[in-house]
Structure formats: structure tokens, C-alpha cells
Amino acid sequence: IGGESSGPGSTDVSLDEELQRVIPLIQKIRTESEIWISVDTWKAEVARQALEAGADAVNDVTALRGDTEMAKVIAEYQAPVILMFSKDSSARTSKQDTDYVDVLDTLKSFFRERLEFAELHGIHKSKIVIDPGMGFFISGKAKYSFEVIRRISELHEFALPLLLGP
């Protein structure tokens, strides 16, 4: 469940607006179902309130780079977290045609650094899922997403669950 788009050309949503979009929905779903709920946010306060409302996990498109308090919230709640690769360090991706010498080497280096950061901030590795950030999160050039799919087994070196989205 997400209350703020991260796609190219999207605009910022205030904290209050994002909370108004996601918290009532999480609460409603939780009263009717035990289905697994992941909140898509880069904001620590949204993550905190979503977890309090019944969300089970946090999907952070900034991989803990967008809000300095996010790692603290994840560690405090011992919540599963999805760390997504993005060529852009902000919560918005661009249509930039990024080129790579080796896209998988870039992803592996990124995840090594992000995993070290997460563990240094009290997030146990068993709580982490990695997402190579397909589409514009990698590049405006589709060939890099296809290369990631072809070589996805190289990310098994992290011994972590993988999440791939269209």
C-alpha cells in the first residue's frame, strides 16, 4: 500500500496527506483480513504509523537513504524491509538513460553497502529483502532490466529473498 508515487514526473506528497492515504486503508484491511501488508514509503513516520496500524513490512524505494530515521524505525519494530536499488538517491526516479559497464556489478556493490548500513543500524539480515529496481529505477534503457532478469541468479550471493516488480 503506497500513498506517494515514485515514478518519473511524480510530485511530493506531504506527510499528512500520505498518512491520510495509507493508514485508514491498512486499518480497514487489518480488521477484515490477516493478509500480508507492505507499506511503500521512504518516510520513517509513515512507516512507524503503518506498522502500528497493522502493516507487516516496509518497502523503501530509497533503500534507507531517504529519511535518516527509517533504519531506526525498522530496527525498533523488527519489521521486514525491502531495500530497492535506484540510480536516483531520492524517492523519485527519473527517465535518465543511465549506462553501466556492468549493471550487476553496480547492483551488487549497492546492496553490499546498503546491507552493511542496515546491519550497523540494528536491522537483522533475516529481515531484509532486496529488489533490483526494474525499469526506470535502473535506467531509461530497457536493456539493463532485461540483463538483470537474465543474470538474476548472481544476486543469490546475498542469500536473501528477491523481489522483482514490473
Predicted regions mapped to residue ranges:
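Alpha-helix-loop-beta-strand connector modules within alpha/beta enzyme cores
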Residues: 11-39, 44, 48, 76-86, ...
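Glycine-rich, proline-tolerant flexible connector loops at the mouths of alpha/beta enzymes
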Residues: 1-24, 134-140
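Conserved anion-binding
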Residues: 6-9, 47, 53, 64-140
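The start of beta-strands in P-loop NTPase/AAA+ ATPase cores
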Residues: 35, 54-55, 126-128, 160
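Short, charge-dense linear interaction motifs
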Residues: 142-144
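Acidic catalytic patch
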Residues: 2, 165-166
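Nucleotide/phosphate-binding site architecture used for ATP/NTP-dependent chemistry
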Residues: 61
